[in-house]
Amino acid sequence: MLHMNSASSADSMEIMESHFDPTQQNDSTIIESRYSPEEYLEQSFEIQRIISGENSEPQTVASQEISDSQEEDTTLTSSQFEDCGTEYNEVVEDDEFRSEDEDDFMDEEEEYALYEAELSSSPSIHEEVIDCNFVHAIRGFEATVEGQVDATKGDMMILLDDSNSYWWLVKMCKNLAIGYLPAEYIETPSERLARLNKYKNSETSNSQQSVTLPPLDIVEKTLEAPSPNFRIKRVTFTCSSNSSDDEMDSENDYEAMVNRTVAENGLEIEFSDSSDSSLSAEYRSESEDHVTDSPAYVDLTELEGGFNQFNSTSFQSTSPLGLEIVETEINGSSTTADSKNSHSPYSKFSSAYPDAENSNISKINISIAGNKELYGNATQSDPSLYSTWIANKHKTASSATVDSPLRRSLSVDAMQSNASFSSYSSTSNTDKSLRPSSYSAVSESSNFTHDVSRDNKEISLNAPKSIIVSQSDSFDTSNVTQDAPNDVEKEPISGQMPNNLSVQSLKQLEVYPIRHSVSIEMPSEKLLSPRLYSSSTPSSPTKGFQKDDEEDSENRKQADKVELSPSSLLRQMSLPVDSSSQSDAQCTTSSVYITAERKAFSQSSIDLSTLSNHHVNNEINRRSFAGGFTSLADELSEMRELLHESPAPLECNEEMVIPTPELDASSAIPSSSISHDEDLLPRKNTEESTSSSSFSSLITSPASLQYDENPFKQSVVAELNNNSSSVPFVDSAHASDIHAYDNDHVSTKNKEFNRRLREFILDPDSLSGLYWSVKSAGVRASRRVSRNIEGESVSSDLDDIFANVLKGLSDEMASLLNTNR
């Protein structure tokens, strides 16, 4: 213990010596130490205690307690000193920071104010209106070179030129000096106006910030004001009817929903199910009237099933609109064919107009009900509509009238559907209207039995045993289908159909030939002209054309005595139809028409045996008359004049002879208009063949040609005498060419041309003729041999022959030209 005290005392002495060294002290200087003030105090107290302990080693308890208390006091004072120093330092630092920030802020404001003062011509603009004719200097400028002008801040100037972006030419208003100033030193009127608005806006914002707020007590009173109370009105519902529990539950839910939705509006809704209301009574009376007026409108469920064959008894009832409803008795239960009448478009209308049977509405609806297109699309969805359509067709057919024979022949009444044939009267009057006799809607034989399938639920009509078809140009039996008859007549058309034409079934139609008795007597001094007809104009198979009902009997007698021309004889001559042209579903037209080509007829050239033996394909070829002729008679009359009343009969040969064409030098076209096309060459079924390489047989010898005053006479007579068709004909273009030329048209130039052509044909080595022929007009060789014509190969054969002829001539010409060189 002593040793430790001595060591510590030695250390303390060293410390004291270092601190109290007189050499280290100076005048008016502060003692510097390596210890802090707190450490220095501690060291001083420690030194004092050591000194006191060395002097008096035995220490009393009181002295120890005093020393302990002193130590506590010293430690307390040191901690307090430390806390005070820290707080003081913080306060000093904060003050310094605040002062620095304030200084910086003040410096920025001053700088900004100075900057604005420098850029603006004046710190504030006093004038309220800016004059756009002047500019102002926003800072001062001193001229350094000649051409510049001095300006002070706020000077008013007139801008003379601002084309340069850096220097503007101005005129000073104070001394009228003219010079250049930097553009950035000049304030334009728009810039001055913007600065004025800036000052005004700042003043306005400052004034708005000074607006006084309302007193607090007023605000509290406004917030504490009570809101208005809304009165909710309760709505009750009463129901007087006795209903089941389920209905009551649903109604209660509905009432509760209505209560929630309409209570706010103060509405009152009553629910009443009483059956004695006027509305229900009116509705009940209307429904009773509907039932009494149309008892046949009932739901039919049996038709939705299936029944194939039954013996039915029927009766008819008429709806308010005149629609006949056919009711059938099936297995003792009476049902109605007009089932599910709710789908009918006339159900509501019939209930609204119960007395419309004798009105015009009933007549209109009868015609609508008779339309097949209206009911045809609805038969698959509702079979009762079709039965209603059938019933109305029976009624409308008895009262329908046809205006004219043309409409009669074009109407759908031409096709009759019946189970048995009725006898025909061939001598009936032609102007008799088509009025069928009485006919029951559904007969006992059950021709139109409704076969309703369970699976498909579609109505299909059983095909009748036979169908009687009237002969008409516009009627085509290919339109006959198994859907439904076009019309139901009570009896077939009298006088419109011969007895020997019938159709046995829909799948196998056979058209029998109709032979008419035609008088062979021909008029004496009159050429026969056929009737003009078209595809839309029907031709009746009876004598003549039927006249309208309004024409008198005299016109009808004249129509019966119309003279028949050869073309009309051919048209009315019926020929058997090949079985190969028939199919299962379609057949040819019931009236077979044969139309001959337009031929030249004379009084003595008609031979009935020739016409009857002439077999021509069953097709109609209509061509217009050439040369402006309105009829065949005018054309033939002109032809007879050109032929100088030639009485030579027309003979039918098996060979076809076409003379050599005569070329016209001026027009370089054949003088004969006979064409080598396929449609003008009759077809024959011979098996001869001619080689295309034999050119000598294809070129007509010029020795056989003889000249006459009319060069066409010989060629025309030769063709008419050697025509291969069994029916004589003259092409319409040929007739027009004959009419165009006359005897005076044959000139010496044409004869010279023909002579040179003949010389060239005889002597192909003639270079001049060959060159002239090929260069100017070309050569077309015509055939003078008999040849088989098979179908469509005629045109191709002729083209090949002509091409070979021209090719040979061209080769010869080229070889001759090469040799002459």
UniProtKB/Swiss-Prot annotation:
Entry keywords, A to Z: Cytoplasm, Cytoskeleton, Phosphoprotein, SH3 domain
Signal peptide residue numbers: none
Ranges of compositional bias, category Basic and acidic residues: 283-292, 554-563, 675-687
GO CC, any one term: cell cortex of cell tip
GO molecular function, one term: cytoskeletal anchor activity
Domain (SH3) ranges: 130-191
Swiss-Prot/TrEMBL GO biological process terms: establishment of bipolar cell polarity; establishment of cell polarity; establishment or maintenance of actin cytoskeleton polarity; establishment or maintenance of bipolar cell polarity; maintenance of protein location in cell cortex of cell tip; protein localization
Residues recorded with modification Phosphotyrosine: Y35, Y40
Ranges where the record places region Interaction with tea1: 527-821
SUPFAM superfamilies: SH3-domain
Region (Disordered): 1-36, 51-79, 267-292, 333-352, 473-500, 529-570, 664-697
Pfam family, one: SH3_1
Biased composition (Polar residues): 1-11, 21-31, 53-67, 333-350, 473-484
Subunit annotation: An essential component of the tea1 cell-end complex. Interacts with win1, tea1 and for3. Interacts with tip1 in the presence of tea1.
UniProt function note: Cell polarity factor essential for the bipolar localization and function of structures containing the cell-end marker tea1 during the normal cell cycle. Regulates cell polarity in complex with tea1 and together with the stress signaling MAPK cascade, contributes to cell polarity maintenance under stress conditions. Required for the localization of for3 at the cell tip specifically during initiation of bipolar growth.
Record-given protein name: Tip elongation aberrant protein Tea4
